[in-house]
Amino acid sequence: MNDELCISVTDKEKEEKILSVLGLCARSRELIMGVPQICDALGSEKKKGKGKYPLIIFESSDTSPNTHKRISDKCAYYKVKHIRLATDGGTLAQRLGKTSMLAAVAVTNKNLCLLAEKYI
């Protein structure tokens, strides 16, 4: 696995800011939520104007080892930055306005991606 593409965030202040940016992404509909949807989006070809492509992926801390490996392998293969948060899936879902748990979310907007990367 490519180590520079997988980062863990443990600082609470930075994580709060990242969660705020993810909330902004959710409100602007520039977020892909859920591991199957993220893997499908990564597998699809990048075509201009067709679909949304993940630029950075945020994973919750309580994902299973198989899910973590699945996300890590996809990120390494497609060269997408992968961030593991200290937040659990329930808190991540709550902060994004969802009722069920979320294992991972992906930002699809370049400018919002840069804003999130600023706090890593």
Where on the chain are the PLM-derived regions?
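N-terminal first-folded block
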Residues: K14-L55
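Signal for well-folded cores of large energy- and translation-related assemblies
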Residues: G43-K46, A76, G97
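Short, compositionally biased "basic patch" segments
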Residues: M1-V21
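Feature captures the catalytic cores and cofactor-binding loops of soluble hydro-lyases/lyases
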Residues: G49-Y53, T63-A93
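Acidic/histidine-rich catalytic cores and adjacent linkers
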Residues: E59
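Short basic, glycine-rich beta-strand/loop surfaces that mediate nucleic-acid
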Residues: Y78-I120
